[in-house]
Regions:
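Alpha-helical transmembrane segments and their membrane-interface boundaries
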Residues: 1-150, 158-194
Length: 194
């Protein structure tokens, strides 16, 4: 999220705790009468590094965390964009990763160009709704490519207020190109090691 301090930080922590308590209450209400055949320790006993599911979990965790670490060490803002893009590209089957990566960056560029066109074509009072338009577009898009296009709108609107439109667009495109390439490379290395 965005860096905050003082009272804003305190309010953010309080809101996170309240949100957590609400989620816990809903989860407890919906699950309390459900029969459970497995306990908490069964999760650890069932873990097998050689199962395809656990192997993917490990690959996904390491891909996202190392990519975000690299971006943070380079002091590049919006490391979360890299993490989200890595999560999007790092799918369970390695054969699907490269095709997804090939769609991620180009359609992010398309989304960025459409955002820039909307940003400069629409009056300023409409700008806050560009993100909502993007959210509706994601909801109605059946394919990954167009979901990627529409997904850029909200992120770029918020980032443009912080960095300016040009820098926000360059950060968004750069983050997605890096994440796509990094995920493909990490998948290759990971598969050779494990």
């Amino acid at each position: 999220g965005y860096d905050v301090a003082g009272k804003s930080y305190h309010l953010r922590v309080v809101s996170l705790v309240v949100g957590m308590l609400i989620c816990m209450g809903v989860f407890y209400k919906n699950q309390k009468n459900r029969p459970h055949k497995r306990g908490f320790m069964d999760i650890f006993r069932e873990f097998n590094i050689h199962s395809s599911r656990n192997n993917w979990y490990l690959k996904l965790t390491l891909t996202v965390s190392t990519a975000m670490l690299i971006i943070n060490l380079l002091n590049i803002p919006r490391a979360m964009w890299v993490g989200i893009a890595c999560m999007s590209v790092c799918v369970p089957f390695s054969s699907d990763i490269a095709p997804k990566a090939k769609k991620r960056a180009p359609f992010n560029i398309v989304g960025s160009l459409i955002f820039v066109a909307l940003y400069y074509a629409l009056p300023k009072w409409v700008h806050p709704y560009i993100g909502i338009i993007g959210g509706i577009g994601v909801g109605y898009s059946a394919g990954y490519s167009w979901q990627t296009v529409y997904n850029t709108f909200g992120a770029l609107y918020i980032a443009s207020g912080i960095f300016g439109v040009k820098t926000a667009v360059l950060l968004r495109i750069g983050a997605n190109i890096f994440a796509s390439l990094y995920t493909v490379l990490f998948d290759h290395v990971f598969n050779n090691v494990f």
